[in-house]
Amino acid sequence: MPSLEPWLWGDSCSWLGMLAMLRLRLHKSNMDFTCLFCCSLAFVLYLNTLGAGFVYDDRRAILANADVSGGTPWQRSFSNDFWGTPLTDSGSHGSWRPLCVLSFRLNYLIGGGFAPWGFHLVNNLLHCVATALVVRVARTLLASVWAVLAAGALFAAHPIHTEAVAGVVGRADLAACVCYLLTYLSYLRHMRWRESGDPRQWLALGATLILAAAGLLCKETAITALLVCALFDVMRGLSGQVDKQRLRSVCIVLGALFCMAYCRLVIVPGPQTAFSSADNPIARTPSAWTRLLTFLYLPVFNLRLLLQPNVLSFDWGMDALPRVTSLWDRRNAQSACFYSVLVGVAWGSCRQLLSGSKEVTHCGVSSTFPQYHIQKVASRKSRSKRKRLANNTKYQAFEAAYHQQQQEALPCRDCNNNNSSGYVYEGSSPVAQAPAQAPHLVSSAFRGSRSSSSCSNSTNSSSSSSSSSSSSSSSSSSLSGGFQCSSKDYALEGMSPANRHACVLIMSLSFLALPFLPASNLLFYVGFVVAERLLYLPSVGFCLLVGYGVSKLMSCNQRTRNILLLSFSLLLAAMSLRTLRRNADWRDEESLYRSAIAINPPKALGNLGSVLSSQGRYEEAKQVLQEAIRFRPNMADVHFNLGILHQNQQVYPAAVECFQRAIKFRPNLAVAYLNLGISFIALGKRQQAIEILQAGSNLDGAAVRDRTAHDQARSSAYLQLGALYVEQGKLQRALAIYREALSSLPGLPQQREILYQRIGDVLGRLQQWDEAERHHRAALELQPNQVAAHLSYGITLARNSSRASEAEMWFKRALKLAPEQASVYHHYAEFLSLQSRHHESAIYHRRAAELAPNDYTLVVAAATAMRLLDRKVDAEMWYRKAVALRPGDAHAHTNLGAILHLLGRTNHAAASYKAALRLQPGDAITLGNLAKLGVTNV
């Protein structure tokens, strides 16, 4: 009877192989689901940002940036800063992020303009990509699936990321993080291909450098990615994973880092002016001791934001973070503990790696003998050198050990290959094993051979039983946290447990500290104290540390694992809820500023007052702005906003006081000069207005941050000044003012177009028709689709009776460009009225009033046009609307009384006349109309 034992043995082996393959697929499936879960969590948590608008810095960086709206060539993004100001300008912020600006421009082109949801959607997707890359990075350092899941989920849900994702300008941090992580992963691929001798290693190295440069073009902090890559390569060498090409790769990476840093710091211009004291008051503190203690505390405070993100703010400037002025401040103890732990962990990890390197050097732990030493003889061109090397006793011993290993490895070719570095782990301590014939294997971390795998053919009963017991224990632990990442992703394969522990800690701290270092104020001062969006990239290291802690705790007993899973689930839920609530704060500016009142009262209240004032909520805005001034009396912006509020309420004396205070606290605030001049004009103080407008138009703008807004305010001051001279009949003086504005403001095409129009109007009044037409043509060349240029040209031509038909053509072109603009209909109606075409004029006057029913001037013009056509009932309707718009205007009541008089409704007419006299006693026209009604006693 034939024996069934071989068949049963073969069948059992096949089943074991199938189970092994199934388990491997489950592991891969779990890792895919990990990435899918984390990305889905990231996307869902930020879905409520799609309905948000542009807030805070978004307005200047996006809405007011010509590099985004297409007002400048796309190449200009590389010579302008993040806000659209030339880097060579004295007021440039110095932040150079051209790729981020170009992404905004692409958003603008594809989304059909400034549609906020498109910008927010891209930010959300970038956060999902960054989350997926964090999972990939975690797989390279953390062996446990639970650790990877914890790191990825925490990164997806952490509330500290809200500013970077919900604020559109945070895209710079999102894109920099994506490039940063891709740089690291690309360099890992380069290392893997380099160690296997794959020529694609150069492709991966080139991709590493390109991605690092792209990260630099997104945000400057991403340049530290090359440091992380070089550091990991060095640690691999210190851990026994030796490769003779390591030094070459590290030198290339560090050389590229130096070149990029040189280009950014030297070739690309930096900021020309210092930041304001309100942005970083600590840097302006006279006491060096206070500056040192406070800046040493800032990393501790940022770590607190990562650990406890319940108190967040859009701005941490001014005095939001109290300064550390005394050595006995308890925050110094926190700083001391923080730096002690940081230095202790870093030093302990480095000592472990260095001691492991010495052990490798002196004990010869690696069983992966470097083959290039064996081939060294054949590569020698000189026969004498080959002979001298072959006779070397150390080389002979090395070659004998190598051939012995090759012979021992032949019978076990089909054994399991774990890419071991020669350690047999007993418990947690590594035991080095190597053939006694190899006295010296590795000279240093940068010299040696490519690591390869080895196997043992020892098959005694004790090893068999130990392997079976270890397999059973590993299968039981896999249910609780022993799921291990595949060797394809895991980059610490072949290291001892102690070296793995050291590498994970150092790499996590590197991801945490290196990107944060340029913005820490420790190396050089920056224009802020704390910025939450700057923690987006460093939080990768924080999440890796948390994930590593989870993996350690998951190796404990079942009760501890259950408690850990429950606790982490609750933590993740709390983080997610906090993120959703924080997203609601970033939905609009009012909610954002209200959320920070308790943290930074002067800045939050000042910005909130401006928002409320723009919404017409004047009384509430007034209280908020006055409260902000009580917190910080020297805020020029708040005084200016309060002046604008008074100006909108036509309380001009109070507005004048506010604008004067704003100029006192910031003498180069051009827009304050402009509005102060407008307030003086409203008060009838023409001479004072001229003096203020002249001073405002002559401001040079040195050290202002928003040069575009400053120049626009200067241009408006020139226009107001010229209009004053035109009103006074000083046409030559007005002409000189407009021409001076043209010569001093060459970089504003829209403002130049208006100036050309004004010059053309003045020249038309002076009957210099050829010059007037030339300037109007110049305005049309600058802005061919500008409605105002068409209207201005038409008005000028209309003054010349011989060119009336040509003037009408330009009015009709303006109507085609702006069929819903009331002023176009009004000017065309005025032209028709001058041509005595009153029926057509009345139609266009009425259309203008219908398009702008709250415009008093247009409503009165429509009423007058109806009266001229003897359509008294229609005229009465429009005059009543005028009275409703301006019940305090005596002329409105007089006009209504006159039309009622013509309609024969004498009692109502008398009532309107009396109302006019109450507002303007003694008006001769109104008294005469009353006398016609027979009313003499008023």
Swiss-Prot record:
Chemical reaction(s) catalysed: a di-trans,poly-cis-dolichyl beta-D-mannosyl phosphate + L-seryl-[protein] = 3-O-(alpha-D-mannosyl)-L-seryl-[protein] + a di-trans,poly-cis-dolichyl phosphate + H(+); a di-trans,poly-cis-dolichyl beta-D-mannosyl phosphate + L-threonyl-[protein] = 3-O-(alpha-D-mannosyl)-L-threonyl-[protein] + a di-trans,poly-cis-dolichyl phosphate + H(+)
GO cellular component: endoplasmic reticulum membrane
GO biological process: protein O-linked mannosylation
PROSITE patterns (UniProt xref): TPR (PS50005), TPR_REGION (PS50293)
SUPFAM superfamilies: TPR-like (SSF48452)
Membrane topology term: Multi-pass membrane protein
Database matches in InterPro entries: TMTC_DUF1736, TMTC_O-mannosyltransferase, TPR-like_helical_dom_sf, TPR_rpt
Region Disordered, residue ranges: 450-480
Function (record text): Transfers mannosyl residues to the hydroxyl group of serine or threonine residues.
This protein's pathway: Protein modification; protein glycosylation
Sample GO molecular function, one term: dolichyl-phosphate-mannose-protein mannosyltransferase activity
Name listed for the protein in its UniProt record: Protein O-mannosyl-transferase Tmtc2
Keywords on record: Endoplasmic reticulum, Glycoprotein, Membrane, Repeat, TPR repeat, Transferase, Transmembrane, Transmembrane helix
Family statement: Belongs to the TMTC family.
E.C. no: 2.4.1.109
Matches recorded under Gene3D superfamilies: Tetratricopeptide repeat domain (1.25.40.10)
TPR repeat extents: 602-635, 636-669, 670-703, 715-748, 753-786, 788-821, 822-855, 856-889, 890-923
Extracellular side: 23-34, 130-139, 186-208, 271-291, 532-533, 581-938
Keyword Repeat attributed: yes
Cytoplasmic side: 1, 56-108, 161-164, 230-249, 313-510, 555-562
Annotated glycosylation sites: 800
Location(s) in or outside the cell: Membrane; Endoplasmic reticulum
Transmembrane segments: 2-22, 35-55, 109-129, 140-160, 165-185, 209-229, 250-270, 292-312, 511-531, 534-554, 563-580
